[in-house]
Amino acid sequence: MAAPPLGRLVLTHLLVALFGMGSWAAVNGIWVELPVVVKELPEGWSLPSYLSVLVALGNLGLLLVTLWRRLARGKGEQVPIRVVQGLGIVGTGLLASLWNHVAPVAGKPYSVAFLTLAFVLALACCASNVTFLPFLSHLPPPFLRSFFLGQGLSALLPCVLALGQGVGRLECLHVPANRTTGPPIEVSPINFPERFSATTFFWVLTALLGTSAAAFQGLLLLLPSPTSEPTTGTGLRVETPGTEEEEEEEEASPLQEPPGQVAGIVSSPDPKAHQLFSSRSACLLGLLAITNALTNGVLPAVQSFSCLPYGRLAYHLAVVLGSCANPLACFLAMAVLCRSLAGLCGLSLLGMLLGSYLMTLAALSPCPPLVGTSAGVVLVVLSWVLCAGTFSYIKVAISSMLHSGGRPALLAAGVAIQVGSLLGAVAMFPPTSIYRVFRSGKDCVDQCGL
């Protein structure tokens, strides 16, 4: 088969990356904006815990997609993808206008609009794992890396935007007290605003999601339909049942090939690589679930408690740079992919050690070690970045290894991601938001005797 035109190939990779960008851009954008909104919403330091649970409850999107596939067999995968993209665009647009609206619930103020829209966006993002990834099974395996690069952009672009926005500044001013008893002077916190508001941030996020939806439409126009005849020379054929075995040989993933393999010499496929329920695949899926339980449930719920004692800047940098570690891990996986199960387990152990340190800081809040020092700020930010980068690399490596199992393996990977995230978030909600195991500090109040 003739080589595909370079321009068409590059354009397809670009569209796949932009398509992947829309999968988690909404939730990632909300996460990196937490340091800005947490000081204005009534939930305070517990807001990340609420958000973790809402993202976990977004797994209902997985059930809705499953129900759609059973009730609408043969309808294709385009409809759920378009619904997911539509929810993302409308949800972030409403969030830009309503994020700071507060309403009383059981006599207490809650950011009802923010939490409700966050749940809607979580539904869309969770559903994307079982709609976007299976759609890629129709494409040659190299495009999977472009998709994960796009998912990295869904974290990187909101991070760049958040870095430009800044986190604002807090100053503690001594002002005369308005009371007859007690000290005549009291310390009052003064908040200085960011470079642009959270409203502007969410509008830009809406534009990014619109770009992703447009890329998907462009991808559908560029690629042949599953019922059309394969076009010689495009190299971008959509799989059909009659050509599955032939394409499996022609499009073997470079992530699975030995370094010495050259064009025209295709090794026999390993039968074990296509056994979804083999012991190796089960271990990979289990590791993927555990990794996502930590990164999407356990650790995000306590991030504010581990960082805010060191200041808003520490929290801002930990959230933003930690999210930037995701696309960097994708780039690293494109260059060096760990195919060893033992190696991935070793990396998981390293990530768990870093996570244990961060959990310890959260448990000691509001007076963790090195609070009030530059060393403490550097250490907590660096720990978050390394922890996020390590786990992100593991997730990309496992998903790439499972790609050889085809659409069922990628669907199982999406389920493992969501189940792990759900268990992690549900486990952390009671200690953070009900029993108040983790304590929050107060602005301009020294609770550590420094």
Swiss-Prot record:
Compositional bias of kind Acidic residues: 242-252
Domain of life where this protein originates: Eukaryota
GO biological process: flavin adenine dinucleotide biosynthetic process; riboflavin metabolic process; riboflavin transport
Glycan attachment residues as annotated in the record: 178
Membrane topology, record value: Multi-pass membrane protein
Record field: catalytic activity: riboflavin(in) = riboflavin(out)
Protein's cellular compartments: Cell membrane
Regulation acting on activity, per entry: Riboflavin transport is Na(+)-independent but moderately pH-sensitive. Activity is strongly inhibited by riboflavin analogs, such as lumiflavin. Weakly inhibited by flavin adenine dinucleotide (FAD) and flavin mononucleotide (FMN).
Composition-biased stretches (Low complexity): 227-236
A Pfam family that the UniProt record links to this protein: SLC52_ribofla_tr
Keywords from the UniProt entry: Cell membrane, Glycoprotein, Membrane, Receptor, Transmembrane, Transmembrane helix, Transport
Example GO molecular function: riboflavin transmembrane transporter activity
Cited function: Plasma membrane transporter mediating the uptake by cells of the water soluble vitamin B2/riboflavin that plays a key role in biochemical oxidation-reduction reactions of the carbohydrate, lipid, and amino acid metabolism. May also act as a receptor for 4-hydroxybutyrate.
Similarity-based family: Belongs to the riboflavin transporter family.
Protein name: Solute carrier family 52, riboflavin transporter, member 2
Organism: Mus musculus
